[in-house]
């Protein structure tokens, strides 16, 4: 298994069967020695990892171990106390506001609660990023939004309100909105949260399908079956430290009892 400070995110190209991991000469995402503290409590302690382009990367760990904080650093919502964060080779910790906005346009975000606007239709939720970031005419935006909804099986739900959707349908709609601008990277926070096992599997498969098309997926999850399904590489955080990184098979065979115990659990939240 790959251990702390041994960068091997690119190994994901040899695992998971999608064959996309080697298409880029540099990693899609790279963290170098990232540390972060809140009120003198260190949440991330010298985190170094890489995510190969076109692969699935799952961050594992119990609640409060720094997984979502790591995701926020990649998004540029937080700046590390020390260390650097690179997205497509650009150090997001050193970018201006305009430069960071440009990098963010290459990323999509699927939040745990789907984060849909309840006051507008499902279709207009998906269309929102297009209206904000393109100069497309209304007809093209509507057509594109319908296409994104069709990709997640919601082609008949454009005019429905978010409150009319089930939890799984809301998650699908959130995914359609996250992919509205065809981002290279998709960041996902707890894709299985609040979903039954069948719906969770369906969401996982949608993420795998996106990965097969070349999208880099970074998912924070407690759900071990989801991590096995999505992740070419897994990384486990514990008390702010990166204690393991490797494939699911390597995690299963780890000599670290904490890692093996986590992998044996169906859900560790």
Tell where the protein language model's regions lie, with residue ranges.
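Helix-to-loop junction immediately C-terminal to a conserved catalytic motif
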Residues: 75
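Conserved ABC ATPase "signature" region
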Residues: 90-91, 138-157
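Conserved ABC ATPase signature
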Residues: 161-165, 169
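A short, proline-enriched helix->beta-strand linker immediately N-terminal to the Walker B motif
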Residues: 180-184
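Catalytic Walker B motif of ABC-type/P-loop ATPase nucleotide-binding domains
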Residues: 186-189
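Helix N-cap at the start of a conserved alpha-helix in ABC-type nucleotide-binding domains
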Residues: 197-199
């Amino acid at each position: 298994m790959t251990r702390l400070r041994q960068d091997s995110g690119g190994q994901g190209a040899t695992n998971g069967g999608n064959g996309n991991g080697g298409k880029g000469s540099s990693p899609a995402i790279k963290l170098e020695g990232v540390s972060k503290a809140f009120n003198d409590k260190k949440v991330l302690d010298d985190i170094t990892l890489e995510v190969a382009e076109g692969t699935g990367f799952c961050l594992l760990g119990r609640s409060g171990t720094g997984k979502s904080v790591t995701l926020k650093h990649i998004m540029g919502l937080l700046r590390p106390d020390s260390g650097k964060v690179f997205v497509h080779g650009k150090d997001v910790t050193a970018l201006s506001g305009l430069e960071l906005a440009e990098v963010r346009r290459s990323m999509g975000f699927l939040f745990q609660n789907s984060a849909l606007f309840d006051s507008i239709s499902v279709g207009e939720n998906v269309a929102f990023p297009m209206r904000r970031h393109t100069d497309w005419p209304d007809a093209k935006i509507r057509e594109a939004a319908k296409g994104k909804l069709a990709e997640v099986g919601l082609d008949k739900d454009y005019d429905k309100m978010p409150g009319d959707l089930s939890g799984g349908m809301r998650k699908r709609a959130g995914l359609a909105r996250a992919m509205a601008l065809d981002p290279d990277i998709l960041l996902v926070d707890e894709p299985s949260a609040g979903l039954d096992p069948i719906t969770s599997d369906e969401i996982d498969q949608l993420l795998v399908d996106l990965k097969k098309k070349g999208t880099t997926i970074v998912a924070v999850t407690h759900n071990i079956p989801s991590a096995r399904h999505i992740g070419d590489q897994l990384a486990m955080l514990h008390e702010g430290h990166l204690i393991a990184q490797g494939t699911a098979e390597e995690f299963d065979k780890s000599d670290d009892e904490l890692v093996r115990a986590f992998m044996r659990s169906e859900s560790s939240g």
